[in-house]
Amino acid sequence: MASRAKTRRSCGVGFSICKAFAEAGVARIAIVSRSPEPLEKARAELAEAWPATQILTYQGSVTDSARMTDILQQLSTVDVLVMCAAIVHNRAPATKLSTEDVQTSFDTNVLATFNLTKAYLATPMPASGSKTVINVSSAAAQVSHTRRAAYGASKAAAAQLLQCFATERDSEAVRIFSFHPGAFYTPAVAEHFSRDEIQWDDVELPAHFARWLAGPESGFLNGRYLWAHWDVDELIALKDRLAKDPAFLTIGLVL
């Protein structure tokens, strides 16, 4: 039975990814969120639209490692783990950030990612014979942003950790990806930007990209950092270069 587990984020990317997998006909989707009301709303909408897919919901924070491990044990086997949960500190110069801002960013965006990935990889192998980890990251991991210093650093650190997990695993059995989902006009974004300031993305963009990553064609991208905007045919055309250059499309130092 194909099974997908998602940790959600409030901007709608997580829910859109759930819908994309449901559209593909997966047998089971498990959603984890701290907030019970949005969690129940997501369950009801998905169950109504795709009655053939089992929708499971669990309340909990990704920072609660014991809770995440318990949920994975209850699910027993999971084909695909999608990590969407993240925390973004208030916009401020690095000199104005508090130690708590930095600590919270790293606890949620790095340590929770590490613990959840490690716990998932320790679960039994599903009948499909492979596991997939999809980390919904941010361009902040690559682009310096002085007003989001801890956020960007934490997203880069998480991507680096996952690259290490990827290099230590047989890519036929375990595939691990990180990707930038795009820019979305949410209520939080509206506090700082106008709708016509840039061209905003549709949440279906990362949803369908995540679904493609979970499919059979993406194995050659194991351990890579990607953007949802990239054309998959162009990525496939880079397969030989990726095989020859382990550092290509990864987070690291360029000299």
Swiss-Prot record:
Pfam families: adh_short. GO terms for molecular function: oxidoreductase activity. Keywords: NADP, Oxidoreductase. The active site is at S137, Y151, K155. It is an enzyme of class 1 (oxidoreductase). Its EC number is 1.1.1.-. NADP(+) binds at K118, Y151, K155, T186. Coiled coil: none annotated. Pathway: Secondary metabolite biosynthesis. InterPro entries: NAD(P)-bd_dom_sf, Sc_DH/Rdtase_CS, SDR_fam. CDD domains: SDR_c. Belongs to the short-chain dehydrogenases/reductases (SDR) family. Short chain dehydrogenase/reductase; part of the gene cluster that mediates the biosynthesis of the dimeric xanthones cryptosporioptides. The pathway begins with the synthesis of atrochrysone thioester by the polyketide synthase dmx-nrPKS. The atrochrysone carboxyl ACP thioesterase dmxR1 then breaks the thioester bond and releases the atrochrysone carboxylic acid from dmx-nrPKS. Atrochrysone carboxylic acid is decarboxylated by the decarboxylase dmxR15, and oxidized by the anthrone oxygenase dmxR16 to yield emodin. Emodin is then reduced to emodin hydroquinone by the oxidoreductase dmxR7. This is Short chain dehydrogenase/reductase dmxR3. It comes from Cryptosporiopsis sp. (strain 8999). The lineage of its organism: Eukaryota, Fungi, Dikarya, Ascomycota, Pezizomycotina. The gene is dmxR3.
